[in-house]
From Swiss-Prot:
InterPro entries, per database record: LytB/IspH (IPR003451)
UniProt remark on cofactor binding: Binds 1 [4Fe-4S] cluster per subunit.
EC top class named in words: oxidoreductase
Residues annotated as binding [4Fe-4S] cluster: C12, C96, C197
Binding positions for dimethylallyl diphosphate per the UniProt entry: H41, H74, H124, S225, S226, N227, S269
Keyword annotations of the record: 4Fe-4S, Iron, Iron-sulfur, Isoprene biosynthesis, Metal-binding, Oxidoreductase
Protein name: 4-hydroxy-3-methylbut-2-enyl diphosphate reductase
Keyword Oxidoreductase: yes
GO function term, MF aspect, one: metal ion binding
Amino acids binding isopentenyl diphosphate: H41, H74, H124, S225, S226, N227, S269
Known function: Catalyzes the conversion of 1-hydroxy-2-methyl-2-(E)-butenyl 4-diphosphate (HMBPP) into a mixture of isopentenyl diphosphate (IPP) and dimethylallyl diphosphate (DMAPP). Acts in the terminal step of the DOXP/MEP pathway for isoprenoid precursor biosynthesis.
Organism the protein comes from: Histophilus somni (strain 2336)
Stored CDD domains: lytB_ispH (cd13944)
Catalyzed reactions per annotation: isopentenyl diphosphate + 2 oxidized [2Fe-2S]-[ferredoxin] + H2O = (2E)-4-hydroxy-3-methylbut-2-enyl diphosphate + 2 reduced [2Fe-2S]-[ferredoxin] + 2 H(+); dimethylallyl diphosphate + 2 oxidized [2Fe-2S]-[ferredoxin] + H2O = (2E)-4-hydroxy-3-methylbut-2-enyl diphosphate + 2 reduced [2Fe-2S]-[ferredoxin] + 2 H(+)
Length: 314
């Protein structure tokens, strides 16, 4: 048996930045540091930060007045920002800049009173935060997950309408939804460039190539990670057995029956250390060769807030 590694895989720039913000806040200010929602959707990462003194909460009422709080990479609503301000919380914002870009699109629509349609998964924290950028009773924001939801929309064609998307969606599914949306509302406006982020796009393309070569695709990522789920779904749609695992302990020996080539990748919030532990476990189970696809190079870097940049000693 051999493993073929997808490339790129694992951490994206937004996740790197979010984790660095928590680590630097702990280093500079000391524990406890409060984090609203899991900073990224990965159990290993969250547990590691918790051990270092990060306290993860779902709502700000769990944070003492005046404390330091970090907003997760998924972003928050304007109401959450206002609550933090009113309670004098010291905020470090780990919202991915590419999510912030979508927030700005929604805020612009809100200011103009333009009706906004967000394509995304109901209940996902990124979607909740993005919907929460709209604050204009003269307009409105509407969530659609699939083409069936579009049929339920009752907006008129003579209204100003714009759309935007969650950043971690399936490229193929979203393209289909946008096509139907444009058929129903021919004058609808949208972003010049797709809101699905570069990392989601690159990792899905890498899995597309990986699935062509594999008998089994293993995706390292947590069950609540949107982009990790999309990778497993994509491989499965291409006719390959796909498994989403948190770590090497989730691997079942029976998966390897009649398998010659294992494709291995990781979601954007899964660290490389987990990939390496999976490789080690698979070697114990008979893998004797590891290859890596060439893939595309990623060089995107997002800076942490200036208050957290540690100056080098001269």
């Amino acid at each position: 048996m051999k493993i073929i590694l997808a490339n790129p895989r694992g951490f994206c720039a937004g996740v790197d930045r979010a984790i660095s913000i928590v680590e630097l806040a702990l280093e500079i200010h000391g524990a406890p540091i409060y984090v609203r929602h899991e900073v990224v959707h990965n159990r290993f990462v969250v547990n590691g930060l918790r051990e270092r003194g990060a306290i993860f909460v779902e709502e700000l009422d769990e944070v003492p007045n005046g404390a330091i709080v970090i907003f997760s990479a998924h972003g928050v609503s304007q109401a959450v920002r206002q609550e933090a301000k009113e309670r004098n919380l010291k905020v470090f914002d780990a919202t991915c800049p590419l999510v912030t870009k979508v927030h700005m699109q929604v805020a612009r629509a809100s200011r103009k009173g333009t009706k906004a349609i967000l394509i995304g998964h109901e209940g996902h924290p990124e979607v909740i935060g993005t919907m929460g950028q709209y604050d204009n009773d003269k307009g409105g924001i509407y969530l659609v997950e699939d083409v069936e939801d579009i049929a339920k929309l009752t907006l008129r064609n003579d209204e100003d309408i714009t759309f935007m998307t969650q950043t971690t969606l399936s490229i193929d599914d979203t393209a289909g939804v946008i096509e139907v949306l444009k058929q129903k509302y021919p004058a609808i406006q949208g972003p010049r460039k797709n809101d699905i982020c570069y990392a989601t796009t690159n990792r899905q393309q890498a899995v597309r190539e990986l699935a062509k070569l594999s008998d089994l695709v293993i995706v390292v990522g947590s069950k609540n990670s949107s982009n990790s789920n999309r990778l497993a779904e994509l491989a499965s749609r291409m006719g390959v057995t796909a498994k989403l695992i948190d770590d090497a302990n989730d691997i079942e020996v029976s998966w390897l029956d009649n398998v010659t080539v294992i494709g291995l990748t990781a979601g954007a919030s899964a660290p490389e250390i987990l990939v390496q532990s999976v490789i080690s476990r698979l070697k114990e189970l008979g893998v004797d060769k590891v290859e890596e696809l060439e893939g595309c190079e990623e060089n995107t870097v997002f800076e942490v807030p200036k208050e957290l940049r540690i100056k080098e000693v001269e």
